[in-house]
């Protein structure tokens, strides 16, 4: 089983169409990886599906970096 970090990075790479090695924890989805607002919504939906969790809109707005996504998932795993 892949770690949460590996799974998040894979989802980010797939959703944003970037190479997995470009996805590092400090990268911002918008500033560094070229995401737009639709990309970020789709990314949150993909994370919700992968980790079987619901991310409220007010929380989703705070998830702007790869590390923030990893931290959120780790904090909300059942």
From Swiss-Prot:
<keyword id="KW-0276">Fatty acid metabolism</keyword>
<keyword id="KW-0596">Phosphopantetheine</keyword>
<dbReference type="GO" id="GO:0005829">
    <property type="term" value="C:cytosol"/>
</dbReference>
<dbReference type="Pfam" id="PF00550">
    <property type="entry name" value="PP-binding"/>
</dbReference>
<keyword id="KW-0444">Lipid biosynthesis</keyword>
<feature type="modified residue" description="O-(pantetheine 4'-phosphoryl)serine">
    <location>
        <position position="37"/>
    </location>
</feature>
<keyword id="KW-0443">Lipid metabolism</keyword>
<dbReference type="InterPro" id="IPR036736">
    <property type="entry name" value="ACP-like_sf"/>
</dbReference>
<dbReference type="GO" id="GO:0009245">
    <property type="term" value="P:lipid A biosynthetic process"/>
</dbReference>
<dbReference type="InterPro" id="IPR003231">
    <property type="entry name" value="ACP"/>
</dbReference>
<keyword id="KW-0275">Fatty acid biosynthesis</keyword>
<dbReference type="GO" id="GO:0016020">
    <property type="term" value="C:membrane"/>
</dbReference>
<feature type="domain" description="Carrier">
    <location>
        <begin position="2"/>
        <end position="77"/>
    </location>
</feature>
<protein>
    <recommendedName>
        <fullName>Acyl carrier protein</fullName>
    </recommendedName>
</protein>
<comment type="similarity">
    <text>Belongs to the acyl carrier protein (ACP) family.</text>
</comment>
<dbReference type="GO" id="GO:0000036">
    <property type="term" value="F:acyl carrier activity"/>
</dbReference>
<dbReference type="InterPro" id="IPR006162">
    <property type="entry name" value="Ppantetheine_attach_site"/>
</dbReference>
<dbReference type="GO" id="GO:0000035">
    <property type="term" value="F:acyl binding"/>
</dbReference>
<keyword id="KW-0597">Phosphoprotein</keyword>
<keyword id="KW-0963">Cytoplasm</keyword>
<dbReference type="InterPro" id="IPR009081">
    <property type="entry name" value="PP-bd_ACP"/>
</dbReference>
<comment type="function">
    <text>Carrier of the growing fatty acid chain in fatty acid biosynthesis.</text>
</comment>
<comment type="pathway">
    <text>Lipid metabolism; fatty acid biosynthesis.</text>
</comment>
């Amino acid at each position: 089983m892949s770690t949460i970090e590996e799974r998040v990075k894979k989802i980010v790479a797939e959703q944003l169409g970037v190479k997995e090695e470009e996805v590092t924890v400090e990268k911002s989805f918008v500033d560094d990886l070229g995401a737009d607002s639709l990309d970020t919504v789709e990314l949150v939906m993909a994370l919700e599906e992968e980790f079987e969790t619901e991310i409220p809109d007010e929380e989703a707005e705070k998830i702007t970096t790869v590390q923030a996504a990893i931290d959120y998932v780790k904090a909300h795993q059942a």
